[in-house]
From Swiss-Prot:
Pfam families: DUF359. This is GTP-dependent dephospho-CoA kinase. The keyword Transferase applies. One of its GO terms (biological process) is coenzyme A biosynthetic process. Its EC number is 2.7.1.237. The keyword Transferase applies. It catalyses: 3'-dephospho-CoA + GTP = GDP + CoA + H(+). Coiled coil: none annotated. Belongs to the GTP-dependent DPCK family. It comes from Metallosphaera sedula (strain ATCC 51363 / DSM 5348 / JCM 9185 / NBRC 15509 / TH2). HAMAP family: Dephospho_CoA_kinase_GTP_dep. PANTHER family: GTP-DEPENDENT DEPHOSPHO-COA KINASE, UPF0218 PROTEIN TK1697.
Length: 173
């Protein structure tokens, strides 16, 4: 008889207080005009959206993101959006779970468009999307009280995100 112990362990990566200010600033082009944002998106083949408002705006305009990530909340309040996502992941506020990063890696290396619903908070999902994305991907995420940020993925953006992520501390969830 063979016995295997398959304990499932998840790591949580937490940013130090000094990095939180870095995470709150926009990286990329900030759009406060929806028409200009949607026009800009036309230049890109693979678009990834993070956030309920941005995802709703993009999909209502007829653009199908390669990956859309939502958490059912807008500014920490429950959203009125009824959109259902195909897969659910868990990621609590203020952290980045290894399991969430692994799911995003799987999707970003795949070929099929997908959507994720985050049980928790979607803000940190931009980090693995940039780390595992392809050159030329466009990540669109909401910037509270300002608009939407478009960040094109390339070696420089990956380097910057990796620099920020390297300052996180890991702990068991």
């Amino acid at each position: 008889m063979e016995v295997r112990y398959k304990r499932k362990v998840d790591l949580c990566f937490r940013p130090p207080r000094t990095v939180r200010a870095e995470l709150s600033r926009p990286y990329g082009i900030l759009f406060s005009n929806n028409a200009k944002l949607l026009s800009y998106l036309g230049q890109f083949e693979r678009i990834i959206t993070v956030g309920d408002v941005v995802t709703s705006l993009v999909t209502r305009s007829g653009i199908r993101p390669f990956l859309s990530v939502v958490d059912g909340k807008t500014r920490r309040n429950v959203s009125i959006s009824g959109e259902r996502s195909s897969e659910v992941i868990t990621n609590e506020a203020g952290i980045l779970r290894f399991s969430a990063m692994s799911k995003i890696k799987e999707i970003m290396y795949g070929r099929e468009p997908r959507s994720l619903f985050v049980n928790g908070e979607d803000d940190m999902m931009v980090i693995p999307i940039i780390l595992y994305g392809k050159n030329g991907d466009l990540v669109v995420y909401g910037q509270p009280n300002a608009g939407a940020v478009c960040l094109e993925n390339w070696e420089g953006s990956r380097w910057r995100v990796m620099d920020i992520f390297s300052k996180f501390t890991a702990e068991l969830c």
